[in-house]
């Protein structure tokens, strides 16, 4: 018998799939990544082919073994983390999807969400699920598929169809149809799950006419769900033992195990998630209440706020405005800015997220003078990411009544020292960058490793953690208050501009 000295994380994202093998110290031993196609059948629609996702996952599992030289039988357990909300419906008998998967960003089910609001279900759905009614979540996507794919409703009523988010789909495929499960964190993003009773909500299922026979069984985030079929894992039957949606996996990977701990992942957008402990905190400001993770018989809840534009603002400087050639260059240029921070960029390219929720707003720039330079503009764009993060974190503080002593950060833009220092300054709290920016995959690996006894408990995980770089606030209070006041005025001004064409005869 080979010694089982490794765990594998499968990180199934929106544009690519990755497999990463970690050793007992949480060090990366090998990895593989593969992109897969995105489909945009109509404006605002985003779809994936679930078989292409499965194909990419098979490919990266092989790639990780090849790169690391590790054999499949040396893997103690597999953890899965995934793009959340993306919806697959497949035929129970053939295992074939009935249509493309509808991706979390896709707006094709917006009319269904709008109708639910018109019919007065907002309060009921918020109280039960912790979510706002939106096409973002899986519920309206399932309804859309049942409405638009011929014969789907009838098949669903006859118990012939299964629904799952990507985690469910991958477990079903890896076990060759033996296991149909999901976990608390993914279930809490469907808008069908009662986060208080920890069960699928019959009232919401009836409202949307979704048969409960389609739904996966909901399990904790760290337990053995089933074993890979040997022919799907290169000859080995390995326990699949951890699962969590990507943002919750990052929370766990950042070891935010205590109430009040908070992390910000700076990706294309930025996702801020706060551990609120064993009681769900419903937000008065349209932040999302969600399940962080459930482990050892306990469930930990979280508040989540998202910013639509973070890393994509830096891409805009590079690709749209051509002010920089590479993303890291934004830091060099911003460091050379000479102005008094009088320029404000409000990157509302697709509207404003929490806590403004203004989908009609568009980007704006304020405070330009004849002396404004490219460097000032780049710095203002970076600062906008930090201002938006402060908007969300201040709202979380207000909603939860929990003091926030430290912000843990990860994701691509967290590599930018200037941005992280400004984030600490504007929040007036310490900001700690993860030593290992692979926090999402690491979170999935930890959950799986704990379930199979690879690691003993949370204390052992904490003892392995490397301390990342700490950024401490250095800005005087008066300067901080004035800068943030300017940001709030810039956002207010942005929201007043809504272009309407002049009507005939005006």
From Swiss-Prot:
Changing residue 232 to A: Loss of phosphorylation, no effect on activity. The phosphoenolpyruvate-dependent sugar phosphotransferase system (PTS), including enzyme I, and histidine-containing protein (HPr) are required for the phosphorylation of His-232, which leads to the activation of the enzyme. One of its GO terms (biological process) is glycerol-3-phosphate metabolic process. Sn-glycerol 3-phosphate binds at residues 14, 84-85, 136, 246. Glycerol binds at residues 84-85, 136, 246-247. One of its GO terms (cellular component) is cytosol. Pathway: Polyol metabolism; glycerol degradation via glycerol kinase pathway; sn-glycerol 3-phosphate from glycerol: step 1/1. ATP binds at residues 14-16, 268, 311, 315, 412. The keyword NADP does not apply. One of its GO terms (molecular function) is glycerol kinase activity. Its EC number is 2.7.1.30. Activated by phosphorylation and inhibited by fructose 1,6-bisphosphate (FBP). InterPro entries: ATPase_NBD, Carb_kinase_FGGY, Carb_kinase_FGGY_CS, FGGY_C, FGGY_N, Glycerol_kin. It holds the Pfam family FGGY_N. PROSITE patterns: FGGY_KINASES_1, FGGY_KINASES_2. The keyword ATP-binding applies. Keywords: ATP-binding, Glycerol metabolism, Kinase, Nucleotide-binding, Phosphoprotein, Transferase. It catalyses: glycerol + ATP = sn-glycerol 3-phosphate + ADP + H(+). The modification Phosphohistidine is found at residue 232. ADP binds at residues 14, 18, 268, 311, 412, 416. Homotetramer and homodimer (in equilibrium). Key enzyme in the regulation of glycerol uptake and metabolism. Catalyzes the phosphorylation of glycerol to yield sn-glycerol 3-phosphate. Belongs to the FGGY kinase family. This is Glycerol kinase. It comes from Enterococcus casseliflavus.
């Amino acid at each position: 018998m080979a010694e089982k000295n490794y765990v594998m994380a499968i990180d199934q994202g929106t544009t690519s799939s990755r497999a990463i093998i970690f050793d007992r110290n949480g060090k990366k031993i090998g990895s593989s990544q593969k992109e897969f196609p995105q489909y945009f059948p109509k404006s605002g629609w985003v779809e994936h082919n679930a078989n292409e996702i499965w194909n990419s996952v098979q490919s990266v599992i092989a790639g990780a073994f090849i790169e690391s030289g590790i054999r499949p039988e040396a893997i103690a357990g597999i953890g899965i983390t995934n793009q959340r909300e993306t919806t697959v419906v497949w035929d129970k008998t053939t295992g074939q999807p009935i249509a493309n998967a509808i991706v979390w960003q896709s707006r094709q089910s917006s009319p269904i969400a709008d109708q639910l609001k018109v019919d007065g279900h907002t309060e009921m759905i918020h109280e039960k699920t912790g979510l706002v009614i939106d096409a973002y979540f899986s519920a309206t996507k399932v309804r859309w598929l049942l409405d638009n794919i011929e014969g789907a409703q009838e098949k669903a009523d006859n118990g012939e169809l299964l629904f799952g988010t990507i985690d469910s789909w991958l477990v079903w495929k890896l076990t060759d149809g033996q296991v149909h499960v999901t976990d608390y964190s993914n279930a809490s993003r469907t808008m069908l799950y009662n986060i208080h009773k920890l069960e699928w909500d019959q009232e919401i299922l009836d409202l949307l006419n979704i048969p409960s026979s389609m739904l996966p069984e909901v399990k904790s985030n760290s337990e053995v769900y089933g074993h890979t079929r040997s022919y799907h894992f290169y000859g080995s039957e390995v326990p699949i033992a951890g699962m969590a949606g990507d943002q919750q996996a990052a929370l766990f990977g950042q070891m935010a195990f205590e109430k009040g701990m908070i992390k910000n992942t700076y990706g294309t957008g930025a996702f801020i998630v706060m551990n609120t402990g064993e009681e769900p905190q419903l937000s008065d400001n349209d932040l999302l209440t969600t399940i962080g993770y459930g482990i050892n018989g306990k469930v930990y809840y979280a508040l989540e706020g998202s910013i639509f534009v973070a890393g994509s603002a830096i891409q805009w400087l590079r690709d749209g405005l051509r002010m920089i050639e590479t993303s890291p260059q934004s830091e060099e240029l911003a460091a050379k800015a000479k102005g008094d921070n009088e320029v404000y960029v409000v990157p509302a390219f697709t509207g404003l997220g929490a806590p403004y929720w203004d989908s009609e707003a568009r980007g704006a720039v304020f405070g330009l003078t004849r002396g404004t330079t490219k460097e000032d503009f780049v710095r203002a764009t970076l600062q906008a990411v930090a201002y938006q993060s402060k908007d969300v974190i201040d709202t979380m503080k207000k909603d939860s009544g929990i003091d926030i002593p430290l912000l843990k950060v990860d994701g691509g833009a967290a590599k930018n020292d200037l941005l992280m220092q400004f984030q600490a300054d504007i929040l007036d709290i310490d900001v700690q960058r993860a030593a290992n920016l692979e926090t999402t995959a690491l979170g999935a690996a930890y959950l799986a490793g704990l379930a199979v006894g690879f690691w003993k408990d949370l204390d052992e995980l904490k003892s392995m953690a490397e301390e990342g770089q700490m950024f401490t606030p250095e800005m005087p209070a008066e300067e901080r208050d004035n800068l943030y006041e300017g940001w709030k005025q810039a956002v207010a001004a942005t929201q007043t501009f809504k272009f309407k064409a002049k009507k005939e005869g005006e």
